[in-house]
Amino acid sequence: MKEEKNITPMLAQYHKIKDQYPDALVLYRLGDFYEMFYEDAHTGARELNIVLTKKKVGKDRYIPMCGIPFHSADSYITRLVSKGYKVAICEQLEDASKAKGIVKRDVIRVLTPGTYFENEKLKSALLGIYQERGRFYIAYLDLSTGEFTGGSLNRDELISFIGKFQPKEIVVQEGYDFSDLRSQFKSIFFSQLPEDYFSEDTHSEFLGFFKTGHISAFGFDTEEQNVIYPLSAVWKYAKVTQKSFLPFISTPKPYREDSYVRLDYSAQKHLEIVSPNEGNIPLLRVMDRTLTGMGRRKLRFFLLHPLKNSKEIIKRQNAVTELVENTELREKIRDILDQIFDIERLISKISSNTSTPRDLVGLRESLKKVSKLKEISKEIKSDLLKESFERIEDYSWLIEKLDRYLEDDPPIHLKEGGLIKKGVDKDLDELKEIKEKGNEWLKSYQEKLRKETGIQSLKIGFNKVMGYYIEVTKPNLKLVPDHFRRRQTLSNAERFITDELQSFEEKILSADEKIKALEYEIFMRIREEVAFLSDRIGKTAQQVGMIDAIQSLAQIAVEKGWTKPDIHDGYEIEIKEGYHPVIKEFMPDFVPNNLKMNRNSYFHIITGPNMAGKSTFIRQSAIIILLAQTGSYIPAKKGKIGVVDAIFTRIGSGDALAKGLSTFMVEMLEMANIVNNATERSFIVLDEVGRGTSTYDGLSIGWAISEYLAEKVKVKTLFATHYHELTQLEREIKGVKNFHMDIFEDGENIKFLYRVKEGFSNKSYGVHVAKLAGIKEQIIKRAYEILYYFEEQRDKKLEEDIYSLKQKENSYLNEINELPLFKEIEDIEKDEYRQILEEIESIDIGSITPVEALVFLNDLKKKIKRLKES
């Protein structure tokens, strides 16, 4: 900040502090307000919609200023942090009345989007990224729960991870170009950290904090060792920003994508698992029957991390089944869970010194309910639930202590008193007795004064500004004795003090201050003891979350009448009368559909008009498979699910269009990801491919991709398309089957039946849909005329082109084979031919995609044609 001349000591102090936090809004404590100055004031006033005023700092000199009340600062801070600002809290470090000169102040904490954890409605989580040799080493830290994890990811896995965990802030090493991530995740706040955050000294501090000597102690493999860079950087960032308020952080755990079904960012968005598209509702909201914060987070994790080990799926499924079938047990568990607070968040607040007395009481009451959960563990039969119940620790000793120490209904603020019960501390009890006897003395003294003065309405009161006083109404003022000293005049009364009352006030207020100080001291000791148990209590909270998530899956299954799918390691998938669980909520008459995929029928081409239900059917199929592999029951009459290793989707392109990518480029990038990563065990959903280019280009690419996926990969695929020509693939490739959306026709009118039927649709019904939408009759009539003409031409020419495609391919190859290029290599003298040969030799057959192969072959053909002509 620019130096100013002739400024007050207070402003000089402010400048010194602001210079240390140039990228933060500094909230500078002045009495009962936090003040902002200069540019911070302009920003604060604008973002908080509060008055921008000015402060006089010299003769005819003013600076911009705005302020927020100390007692309601949290709501203002939340608004600033949620908008992506860093906020530095600068507190008074001494009593202003006792300070010599300027009051000591310093920043006690820096709040950022990724580290502000007190507000339960504002999700905060921090992601650190360290890049080396094409790998992304990551560390994820949620200070609100203490969750800490790290891993080694490729770029696609990184994007998927960000989509799943949705951090509010990403920290990277200085100089790292994160512009591509910023453009994709506009709501995330990015921070660059200096090199020392990634240094060996920081590594040593980090390992020392967790009392270990090497990263392998956390379970990281040799090839994951670089994860220490983001882990230690994120830990230091939290430590530097939170200072003495650093909450409990659990021991880092390895995060490995290969433990779960691959669910990339596109699939997360297209299936709307936790984040809906505009105007829609996510799957999570429909599925959620959890009763605790821990359970809600665990259920979210389940949906974003489906299992791919059949034994693990069945183990979780059996736990769900036990609660589905045992209504009494399920309701007993739900009744207990409904009374448990978010223990993980409470532990974070308690360990960070930001908790209130009520937080500790909330923890006490929650642990009582957890003990009740423990009591019913003998009724549990399924392995997974039994493990969770058995891992719940016995905290009866801690509950007893908190019961004995803490009042049942303490105040919100620490220093108001009323925190500690009688019998805890002898000195405290004596002081409380003085105060209680004081109350008796006041009643007695008030009665005495009434008798002496004859003023029956005389009363003794107290307020924080004036202290104790004797109040007499104006009609009785003539009866006031001389030894009453006037303290205050009101509109209808006068207030007085006497020597006796003043002496009592000094004595009782002294006792009250001592009570508050001693209670605060005792409370802080208790809080420290509980904070020491954070790790153990946190592990119990995780088990409560697991139990809650499982009962939630059971509850939704019972409510909706879902069925238990048969999970197996085979290839087949069969779903009978399945439906979309979200759409069904708003369409009770939703039409269910069947899906059967096996070695003879695994690539389904689905045709039919828009609005007929193609997109809904392919999405619901993916969602049902996903739910089955979370261990959930499914929205279907029956299900037989061969475990998949990945769910891929190619639907829509809105987000990427905003980044300046064409529709076609978006499609090709997504298809490249699918083609490069899909295996025979995957499941693919394609909703149109090749829309963003010419009809023939789009059809050719759709055809080539379908051939590759069906012939080479043999991956289970649902391909919804308007390219009716693709239905001819059923004749060419075993496993390709045609399906269409059933339509009822009545003359020129149609009715969508929303049923998937075998065979292909030879009509698009696009004009019918336009008619339903209300397009003018004359346009509809003209559209039919044009449609009939195009269909006639297509029948003559397009089918001929498609059938001759393979012959043309062979013709191209024959042309190439006849060239000197493919005769004796030693006879080739032309540099152009040699260059072409080198290009061919350089191709990696194992990694080239079908689309890349087509482009390469086309370029090669053009080059050879030019050479022949020359």
From Swiss-Prot:
The keyword DNA-binding applies. InterPro entries: DNA_mismatch_repair_MutS, DNA_mismatch_repair_MutS-lik_N, DNA_mismatch_repair_MutS/MSH, DNA_mismatch_repair_MutS_C, DNA_mismatch_repair_MutS_clamp, DNA_mismatch_repair_MutS_core, DNA_mismatch_repair_MutS_N, DNA_mismatch_repair_MutS_sf. It comes from the Bacteria. GO terms for cellular component: cytosol. One of its GO terms (molecular function) is damaged DNA binding. Keywords: ATP-binding, DNA damage, DNA repair, DNA-binding, Nucleotide-binding. ATP binds at residues 608-615. Gene3D superfamilies: 1.10.1420.10, DNA repair protein MutS, domain I, MutS, connector domain, P-loop containing nucleotide triphosphate hydrolases. GO terms for biological process: mismatch repair. It holds the Pfam family MutS_IV. Coiled coil: none annotated. NCBIfam families: mutS1, PRK05399.1. This protein is involved in the repair of mismatches in DNA. It is possible that it carries out the mismatch recognition step. This protein has a weak ATPase activity. Belongs to the DNA mismatch repair MutS family. This is DNA mismatch repair protein MutS.
